[in-house]
Amino acid sequence: MRALAIAATGMDAQQTNLEVIANNIANINTTGYKRARAEFTDLLYQTERMQGVPNRANQAIVPEGANIGLGVQTSAVRNIHTQGNLIETGNKLDVAIIGQGWFQIEAADGSTLYSRAGAFNKNADGNLVTVDGYNVIPNINIPTDAQDITITRTGQVTARIGNAADFTQLGQLTIANFANEAGLKPLGDNLFSQTPASGAPVVGVPDDPSYGYVKQSYLEGSNVDAVKEITDLITAQRAYEMNSKVITTADEMASIVSKNLK
């Protein structure tokens, strides 16, 4: 009985949907987190009767066919790269990107990763790093006697060194754009890597045309909408229950047939 197998694919799809929603809710307070959405496509169809072929008398064309779908499958889990809410922190090394762009982060193996989480700090060498200690690209070194650190909307990092009256430029933040942000691969720890689907990064200066700008002492919160996630959770739960009901009904029908054959 095909209904059993079809409903099973529906339950499996809704299980995936529930897991994606659960992960969104779990990361509702994660800096720079981008909510995900499960997307589904129908499976193959079994043709019971072809459309567009001559009828039995060969006098007319059959206008409609009979194609029975065999279920559903998960086609993608897409990250939605919309702007998250801004959170004021008062920390001079916290930076939020407003608009398009990704911070460039140097991974342990020397490769470049990308993040929207601008919760930066200084390491023992004075280099600007992420909360996990990865260097920001390009490298920006902040002397121990630096005061009044300022990061402009264009990414220029300046500070007064020691008792100097004038500001000294310490470096320039750059950000990367991608042709297809949905093609970036999430790695955890607020990091993404480029893939052939995302295209190569195009690096530029904040506030240039087609690039967002940066805001000091702010962080970008997650773009998870709690109300929407709870609504989607209820919808997924109901769909799961209905597929379960189909399996129960198909099993009862098969049971009736088997009893009548005795």
From Swiss-Prot:
Cellular localization per UniProt: Bacterial flagellum basal body
Gene Ontology biological process: bacterial-type flagellum-dependent swarming motility
InterPro entries, sorted: Flag_bb_rod_N, Flagellar_basal_body_rod_CS, Flagellar_FlgE/F/G, Flg_bb/hook_C_dom, FlgE/F/G-like, FlgG_G_neg, LlgE_F_G-like_D1
A Pfam family assignment: Flg_bbr_C
Signal peptide: none
Keywords: Bacterial flagellum
Domain of life of the organism encoding this protein: Bacteria
Cystine pairs: none
Primary localization: other
Gene Ontology cellular-component annotations: bacterial-type flagellum basal body; bacterial-type flagellum basal body, distal rod
Subunit structure: The basal body constitutes a major portion of the flagellar organelle and consists of four rings (L,P,S, and M) mounted on a central rod. The rod consists of about 26 subunits of FlgG in the distal portion, and FlgB, FlgC and FlgF are thought to build up the proximal portion of the rod with about 6 subunits each.
Protein family membership: Belongs to the flagella basal body rod proteins family.
Protein name: Flagellar basal-body rod protein FlgG
The organism's taxonomic lineage, starting at the top: Bacteria, Pseudomonadati, Pseudomonadota, Alphaproteobacteria, Hyphomicrobiales
